[in-house]
Amino acid sequence: MRKYLTVAALGILLTGCGEKSDFEKAINEKISKNGVCYGFSKENNAKVVEDFRLGTPVRVNIYGRDDVDPVLIGLKNTGFLNISYEQEMFKRVAILETTDKGRNTKFWDSNNGACVGHRAVAEVKSWTEPSEGNGVKMTQVTYTWRLDGVPGWVDKKAFSGVKGMVEPEETKIVLVKTNNGWAAR
């Protein structure tokens, strides 16, 4: 009898682990697709990007209340960029210029800009019991993520303002059960 109870308990335990790893896989498929990057808007052409990489200053509009993206702050803190500001009528403009150190490091990718890694699940912390709703089976998962694939030129202390660089960030996501397993929506 003890043998059967031990096998049953082990089966239940392994089922929970399987679900947890399935959740992690589904979340990673969603959150790791795009890098954590700073780039120019799509209207800037290849010539502007190449000139910037060679040291020509580029003017970038700053929208909203935030002064500057945390990736830009990290690039400035590392000594790869000089950033100055001007006010133009009703908008603020940042003037970005690569330094000698920045040009030698080649931190800028012409397609994506400066990327400091991508999000990856650090830990699946908890989830709701999967339930039916609107004809689908779903669950809400609480997890932490951190930056993964961080390039060698990134000084984590200089980029500490970028979420997930130093400490994992906690968030929630809804997963839906499909014929191919769990998927993030």
List where the protein language model places each region.
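Sec-dependent signal peptide recognition
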Residues: 2-8
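C-terminal motif of bacterial Sec signal peptides marking the signal peptidase cleavage site
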Residues: 14-16
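Bacterial lipoprotein signal-peptidase II cleavage site
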Residues: 18-23
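Post-signal-peptide N-terminal segment of Sec-exported extracytoplasmic proteins
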Residues: 35-67
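Basic amphipathic alpha-helical segments that dock to polyanions
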Residues: 64-82
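Accessory beta->alpha helical hairpin/"wing" motif in late/C-terminal subdomains of nucleic-acid enzymes
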Residues: 78, 82-121, 128-130
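Short beta-strand edge/turn micro-motifs at domain boundaries
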Residues: 82, 140-147, 164-185
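Short, cysteine-centered beta-strand-loop-beta hairpins and adjacent loop/turn segments enriched
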Residues: 101, 144-166
